């Protein structure tokens, strides 16, 4: 069957992105708007927000064959084992029906020792999904959670229209590389994607690898994005970048929450503290690549801070959980829709004994499944009837 019908790629077909940039090749999904990107000078966040975690094409069609032309950008770390290609996953009526990868594209080579980067342009690739059921159906193509992807062209063997919006509530989540999906098996295997699917909500994933840092421009982006439930997972990046001390942390959390509440005054909002991570439980940052492990061809991390500096204000995960619990308790006196969740309820010490973090920092696929299953219970508690859209931000 030949996919000969070309459908223009527009925002009506894309979910989970805050903005689509028109490039020389096609559409580049962004998870932060242009105004926020203009205020950011950190290449790590620029990389993370342009990786389309949680972004998917959502179509209604009878098509049995779907082709998507993409221009992927591959990351290569000099001296480290090669990274697997990003995965595109196709779902039919919510069920997995195909996987594909772009085997080539632009390449960015990163020198971990110096931070220097080198870019090589590459070709557009065509992803083909065939033998889909010949009936009207909802088709989603989830883009790789960890690979910058430009959408170039969409072809099918039957007409396509945008999938109906439906009345599923929108869950907006913000967090670190763990929320972004680091080391998950694929884009539907990140814990936020799993939790959303299990609880029947629409995901907007603002998990940014290395970049959940209480940035005011991120708070403004959340403020201005419609959502029926907001969850903010705060802590691990602030510790492993050694970004701030206790004195700055509390006011920064208050400011972030104040900004989000300007647009969502009564939206259910849950602050989630860090998962259990032995490296930083009681040892401050910064965290760094373990060069001995790299020399053996393994990727691992270590904490470089000194626990003796905690009384002087250095942050650890233990301190951050205490602070977040205190702040949410204080604020909830005037904010009945604000809650606190200890991240160790999602992944705690006993989980770590059974499913350790392979590189000391990031969960693998099995651990993403465990966290996602547990978080689905949190979402079901918020939306016991499968939810009802309320919209927001407030006019």
Q: Where are the regions that the model predicts?
A:
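Serine-esterase "nucleophile elbow" of acetyl-processing enzymes
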Residues: 132-133, 139-226
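Oxyanion-hole/transition-state-stabilizing segment in secreted/luminal serine hydrolases
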Residues: 195, 214-262, 270, 274-284, ...
């Amino acid at each position: 069957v030949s996919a000969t019908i070309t459908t223009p790629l527009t925002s009506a077909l894309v979910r989970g992105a805050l903005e689509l940039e028109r490039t020389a090749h096609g559409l580049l999904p962004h998870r932060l708007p242009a105004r926020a990107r203009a205020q950011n000078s950190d290449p790590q966040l620029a990389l993370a927000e342009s990786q389309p975690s949680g972004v998917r094409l959502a179509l209604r069609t009878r098509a049995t064959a779907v082709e998507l032309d993409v221009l992927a950008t591959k990351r290569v770390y000099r001296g480290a084992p090669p990274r697997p290609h990003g995965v595109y996953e196709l779902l039919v009526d919510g069920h997995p029906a195909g996987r594909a990868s772009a085997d080539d594209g632009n390449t960015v080579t990163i020198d971990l020792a110096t931070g220097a980067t080198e870019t090589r342009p590459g070709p557009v690739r065509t992803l083909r999904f065939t033998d889909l059921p010949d009936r009207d159906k909802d088709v989603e193509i989830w883009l790789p959670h960890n690979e910058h992807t430009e959408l170039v062209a969409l072809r099918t063997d039957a007409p396509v229209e945008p999938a109906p919006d439906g009345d599923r509530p929108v869950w907006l989540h913000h967090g670190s590389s763990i929320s972004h999906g680091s080391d998950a098996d694929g884009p539907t295997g990140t814990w936020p994607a799993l939790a959303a699917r299990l609880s029947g909500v629409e995901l907007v994933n603002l998990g940014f690898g290395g970049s959940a840092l209480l940035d005011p421009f991120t708070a403004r982006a959340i403020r201005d994005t419609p959502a029926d439930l907001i969850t903010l997972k705060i802590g691990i990046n602030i510790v492993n970048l050694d970004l701030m001390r206790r004195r700055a942390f509390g006011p920064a959390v208050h400011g972030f929450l104040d900004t989000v509440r300007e647009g969502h005054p009564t939206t259910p909002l849950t602050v989630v503290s860090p998962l259990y991570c032995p490296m930083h439980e009681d040892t401050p940052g910064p965290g760094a690549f373990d060069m001995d492990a790299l020399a053996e061809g393994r990727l691992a991390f270590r904490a470089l801070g000194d626990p003796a500096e905690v009384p002087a204000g250095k942050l650890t995960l233990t301190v951050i959980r205490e602070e977040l619990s205190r702040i949410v308790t204080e604020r909830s006196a005037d904010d009945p829709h604000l809650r606190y969740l200890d991240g160790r309820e999602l992944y705690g010490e006993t989980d770590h004994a059974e499913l350790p973090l392979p590189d000391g920092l990031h969960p693998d696929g099995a651990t993403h499944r465990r966290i996602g299953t547990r978080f689905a219970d949190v979402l079901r508690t918020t939306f016991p009837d499968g939810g009802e859209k309320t919209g927001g931000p407030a006019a």
